[in-house]
Structures are given as structure tokens and as C-alpha cells.
Amino acid sequence: MAVVGTLTVPTGTTNKVAQSSETRNAPAKATDRASSDEETTPSDEPSPTPSPEPSPRRYSGVSAKVIKLRKSDWTDVWLVTLTHRGQSNFIVSPLDARGAEQSSIVNEIGIYKGSVLLNEDEGTETAALKIDADGKWTVTLKPISKARQWTGAGLTGRGDDVVIVNPPSAGLTTVNARHSGSSNFIVDAYTESSRENLVNEIGSWRGEVPLPDGTILVTVHADGVWSFKKS
């Protein structure tokens, strides 16, 4: 597992150190045999059981609404998938435990479908989501592990998205990015210790940018079709 602040995503690796066959099969020393009956070696200790992932939380409604989250969900980092079928504003803003409104996670007009992060910044707490809409909407909170996986060289998508880079980037890696749209095109990369903005443009755009070493997650904010290709 890898952590960005409070953000935890799977990277396809574990923290266990595998022993070589020579080490596993080597005969024990006499002193080791004498103590083995009385002591439990670290390798014999059971591995801690990982905490189960929370199940998805799905909410739906029409027009304005305040969704109060379970208290146990307030500080978790979530992948939030949203839809809206309306003609006017669709704005989703987190509220803290005192009801204070935070920066919106979605601010669009008309029909919308996309995925964004919630509580990715360390210390963030969300007690509720304030929905401003004129049509039907859905909001689904899911564990980060349910995000799309970027496993090959190329990746395509449309609109807002969150993508796990698997395996994480290593060494000098560049990304050729393209966007066909009329509004924002913002791309951020997350490593175990930092977040870096890769692209911040408006409208159609194409270019090549470096992907930070150790990138485990990429977020995209876009209104059109986009594509990435690593090299």
C-alpha cells in the first residue's frame, strides 16, 4: 500500500520481504535450535489482518439536498462518482462538522458524469455533501481501490476521472497528453509524499509533460475527451 497524506491506494506490491531459498533451507545453528522451543521468531508471527474496505455508499435525489455522511466516513479518503441529468448548475460542496462549506468537488452546468477525490488532503473532514442541482443526481462513495487502473502505455477517458498508476512510474517517464474540449483541462499526479500539477489549460490542448518518479495516482479534470501515452 502507498500513502499520500491520508490517501491510500494499492500499488500491486507488499511490504513483506521474501526470503531466498538458500536462507529458508539453511540448517539451523545449534544455538538457534536450543532457543526455538522457547521463542517465536518474527517469521512465525501471524501477519496482521488488514482492515476490510468500506462498502460503497450510494445516494440519489432530485434538486437541492444535503447528504449527511456516516460519522465513521468523515475522514476516509473516497473515490466519488457523480451523475446529473439537468440543465442548470450542478455543484457539490463538502461541509465540515460545524456545517462550514468547503471548496466544491464538482462545479458544472447541465449533464454531468465523472469521478473525483474526497478528503485527499491530510486532516480533511467531511460530515456532509451539499448538492445544488436542478435535475436528478446520484453520488456514490467508493474505496480508492475501485478507481480505474492505468496498466499499459496508453489511457483514454472523458470528463473528470481518477486513475491508479499500476505499477507506479519509475525513473524518467513522460506523458503525451491530449484534450478535446472547451473548458478546463487539469491533471495532477500523486506520489507517496507529494502532489504535483502536470497540466492546467483551457480548451483543446496537446503536449508532453514529465510524470514524477513514483506516481501512484493521477486525477483529471476535463470536459472533453482526453488521452495519455507514457514513454
Please give the residue ranges for each predicted region.
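Hydrophobic membrane-insertion alpha-helices, especially the h-region
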Residues: 1-7
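N-terminal low-complexity, Pro/Thr-rich disordered segments
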Residues: 7, 11-57
